Amino acid sequence: MSTTTAIDDPAGLKTTRQRNNQPQQSEIPLPSPSISDVDSDSNKGDDHRDAHVKKAYGRTPDGTGMHTLLSPSQTHDMVSQLLDPREPKNLSDYIVLGVLALHIWLAWAVPAPYNKYLLGFAFTFWRLAYNAGIGYLLTVQSKYTLLVTWARRLRAFEQPATNPRPWLYNLLKTELETKIPKDYKMDEAPIEYNTWLAFRRIVDLILMCDFVSYCLFAIVCAHTPEDEGLGMLLGRWVGGIALVGFNLWVKLDAHRVVKDYAWYWGDFFYLIEQELTFDGVFEMAPHPMYSIGYAGYYGISMMAASYDVLFISIAAHALQFVFLAFVENPHIEKTYNPPPPRLRAESEIGSQTEADALVTKELNGNSDIPQPVHNMIGSFDLFRVTDASSLIIVACFIALTVVTPTTRTYQTLAVVNAIFWRLWYSVGLGYILKKQSEKKMYTRHFLKFGESTGEAWRQWKGLYHISMILCHVSFLTACWKMYTYPEDWSYGSVLLKHVIGVSLIALQLWTSSSIYESLGEFGWFYGDFFFESPRPPTYNSIYRFLNNPERVLGAAGFWGLALITWSKAVFVMALVSQLLMLGFISFVEKPHMQKIYGQNLRKEAGLTKFVKKSLPAPVKRWQQGVDKVLDETKHFAEDFIDAALTRLSAGSSNFVKDTTALFHKPLRLSINRIDRDLAGYDPKHYKLSVEGEQLIAPDEKATRKESADARVPKDVKTKVFQYGAPIRVKWTAPANHSKKDWVGLYLVTDNRNRDFTEVPSLGRWIPTCRGQYDTTTDEGIVSYDEKVKSEGVEGPLVQGEMVFEGDKLWWTQGVYEFRYHHHGKHNVMSISEPFEVRIPLVVKEGTELTIEEAENALLPIVRNCLDRDPEIAPETVDEPWGAHVERDGKYAERVVYAIREMFAIEFSPAVVPADGNVKKLAWRVVNGRIALAPYSMSLQSRRPPTPVADSYK
C-alpha cells in the first residue's frame, strides 16, 4: 500500500528502496524470507512488502517499547471474499453487497440524465472517502497510532467480563474469525493486528463502491458518436479493451507480489520481518499502481466515448497522486528510510554529497569553508545576474510575441528563432561539452586568464541555464504564434487533442523534476565533465526504470504542444528537438559516460530487463540476433562518421522547478465554547507554576535609557527563559478533576478572555493524565495525580508535572502563558504567570565578533533548536548534526531565526544542512558580518546614551 523509493545502486541490481529493519529490541530470532515490491490499493502504492511464503513474522510495538512477536494469518483479497461462494460470508460482506446492489438499482431505476448525475456524485463521494477519508485515518495512525488508541479506549477487543460494550466484542469476534477460520483467534492476537483486520472491512466497502460506481457512471454515459466510422469504432474498443486488460494484469501481478499485507496498508499497524526484492510490475514504472495502474480508467473512457468519463477519470487519477504524496510517501520515509545515526567525528561529516564536496573544494580551495547553497535551479534570485538575465529574456520574448501581429512573416520568424535556439542549445552546447570531455577546452580557457576551475564551472552553469531558457521560451512563443483558439470545442477531436497535449506536457515536467531530483545540481549541469566523479553512477528515482529517460520522455511536452496547436511547423520543431536530443545522448553523453565510468555502467534498465524476461524463448533468440546486427551496424556508422567529419552533438535538458509542498498540520483540539459540567469545580483550587532555564537576571533589565528611578533595581518577578529550552509546568487540581483536563501554551496577546481560550493550541498542549488522548500527546507527562497536602482547602488535591519541549514550544520570541483547561474543552481553570522567551543579542550591529565568540554563543542555541536530541544535536562545535536537519526543514528555520536575532544577520535555511556543524556556521556568521561592516547603519557604538536629568527624580 505504499510507494517505492529507490536507493543508490551502482550495479543496477538492487535499485529499490532499501528497507531498514526496526531496532532489535528483542532477542527473539526471526526468519527473514525474501519479499517483493509492494503496492497499495485497489489502486494503491507500490511498496514491495509481502512475501512469497506461507508464513510471515512481524512485530507490533507494545506499551513498554518492546515488540510482540506475531504470526499474521492467511487472508484473501476482497473480490474473492465478496464474490466467491466458497468463501465464508458475514454481516459486513452482506452490507457491502447490499450497497453495491443499491448502486446497480439506481443506475437502472433512475431515468436519464439524472442517473448520470447521481452516479457521478456517488463516485465522487466514494473517491473522496478513499483519498480523504482513508487518507486521514492512515495519517493519524502513522503519526499518532490513533486507530489503535481508539480501539484500546473503546475496549473493543477485551473480553465481555471487562468490556463495557460486549455487543461490540461479539460482533467483531464473529466478523473477524469468520473471515479467517483456520489460524486466527481474536483474543490471542495483538490489538494492532485486530485493528488492522477491522480497518480492512471499512476499506473493502469504500474500494468496492468506488470501483462499481465508476463503472456504472461510465455505462450510463456511454454512447456512439455521430458519424463515427467503423475504423474509429473498432479502434476505440480494441484500444479500450487492451488498456483495461493491461490494467487488470498490473493489478493481478501487483497482488501476486504484495499480497494483502501491503494491499491494506498493513505496515501502518505492524511490520513484517522481511527484506525487499525487485520483481514483476514494479520493474516497469515508478509507482506502478498510481501510474500505469490507472490505464484502465482511460480504456473505459475510450469505450464509453464520453468526455465526462474522461475528465472524472483524470480527476480521480490526480487524487491518487495527492494521496501518494501526503499519505504514503511520508509514512514510507518515516518507517523505512529513517535518518542515519548522527556522526560523531568531524572527518565523518556527511551533510554534503561527495560530488558537492569536490566542487566546494575546487571553488574555495579550503574544505573547512562552507559550501555554496544557492542552487541555480529552484532558487530564483533577482540579485543574481543569471536569474535577472533570464527574467529579462522571458519578458522580451513575451512582449515581442504579444505586440507583433500574427501574420505568416512573424510566424515564420518565430519558428526560425525557435529552431535556431534549439540548434544552439543542442549542437552548440554539445560541441562545448564534447571538447570539454576530450581536452578540457572550456576549463583551459579560464585557466589561461588566471581564473580557477570553480570560475569555469560557475560560468558554464550560467551559460547552460540561460541557453535552456532561450530554447524553451522560443519554442513556446512559436507555438503561441501558430495556435488558433478553437471556435467550437466539441468539433471533431479538438478537446481530445488538448487533453492529450496537456497530459504530455505534464509528463515532461514530471520527467524533468525526477531527473533533477536524482542527479542534483551537479548532474543537471553535467558536473562530471568538469570534475572527476568521486563515485560510480547511481540508478535511483526515474533512472531505476530507464537508462536515459530524456530519450523517451524528455520531448513529450514538445509533442503535446504540437497536438494542441495542430500545426505542421510545430510538428517539425518537435521532430527536430527529438532528433537533436537523441543525437546529444549518442554523441556527447554516452561516450563521456563510457570514458569515465567504463564497466560500472548498467547494461539494461529495469523496464528493459522486465520486457526481455517476459518474451517467449523464440522471440528472445530473434531479439538477440537483431541486437547483434544493430551493434555491428552502429560500430560501422560510428567509424564512418569519425573518419568523415567532426562529430557535432545535440542534446536537451528540460527546465524544471522542483517544488514540494508538504503541509504538516499539528494536532488540534476542537473548540467548544460552552461546558455544561463546570458545577462543583472551583478555579481557586487550580494552580500552575512554571520553571525553565533563566536567560538573564532581573537587575540586568535596567539600561541607561530609563529615568533615574527606573534604573534602580527592582524586585522584578517576570521570568525570561532561553529560546528553545524545555519548560517544566507543575499543576495542582482537585482530586476529582476531569481526566481529560489539559494544559496549553499561548502568547499572552492571543487571548483577550481570561475565562475562555479563543484560539486553538496548534499542537502546543499536553493532557494532565495519560491514556485519555492518543499516545503522542502523552509525551511530556512526567507525573500526574499525585496526592498533596491541602491545608485550608475543602477536599483533597492532586498535582502533576509536564515538560514542554520541541514541537510543543513556540519557536518565536514573545511573552507567553500556560492555561489549564477543563475536560477537553477551552474553559480556563487557571493561568500561569506570564514569562518571556528571548534570544540574547550576542553582538550589536557595527561591533566586532570573533569566531570563538560566535561558536560559544551558537552551540547552546543550536542544541536547543535541535531539541537537544542526542541523535541530532552536537555536543561540540566540530561535531556534525544529524541527518534529520536535512530532512526536516523546521530545524534549519529555527537556527536561522536565532542567528538573525543574535547576530543581526540573515541566512537562508539551506545554509544550515549545508554547513553541517557549528564551526562552519560560526565562520559564515563572522565573515558575513565582516562583509556587512562597511555598510552598517548602527550608530550605537559612536553615540552617547540618552541623557537623563537628575532633577526629574
UniProtKB/Swiss-Prot annotation:
GO terms for molecular function: phosphatidylethanolamine N-methyltransferase activity. Signal peptide: none annotated. Keywords: Endoplasmic reticulum, Lipid biosynthesis, Lipid metabolism, Membrane, Methyltransferase, Phospholipid biosynthesis, Phospholipid metabolism, S-adenosyl-L-methionine, Transferase, Transmembrane, Transmembrane helix. It catalyses: a 1,2-diacyl-sn-glycero-3-phosphoethanolamine + S-adenosyl-L-methionine = a 1,2-diacyl-sn-glycero-3-phospho-N-methylethanolamine + S-adenosyl-L-homocysteine + H(+). Residues 115-117, 223-229, 301-306, 406-412, 481-490, 590-953 are cytoplasmic. Its EC number is 2.1.1.17. Residues 18-27 have a biased composition (Polar residues). Gene3D superfamilies: 2.60.40.2840. It is a multi-pass membrane protein. One of its GO terms (biological process) is methylation. It is found in: Endoplasmic reticulum membrane. Pathway: Phospholipid metabolism; phosphatidylcholine biosynthesis. This is Phosphatidylethanolamine N-methyltransferase. It comes from Podospora anserina (strain S / ATCC MYA-4624 / DSM 980 / FGSC 10383) (Pleurage anserina).
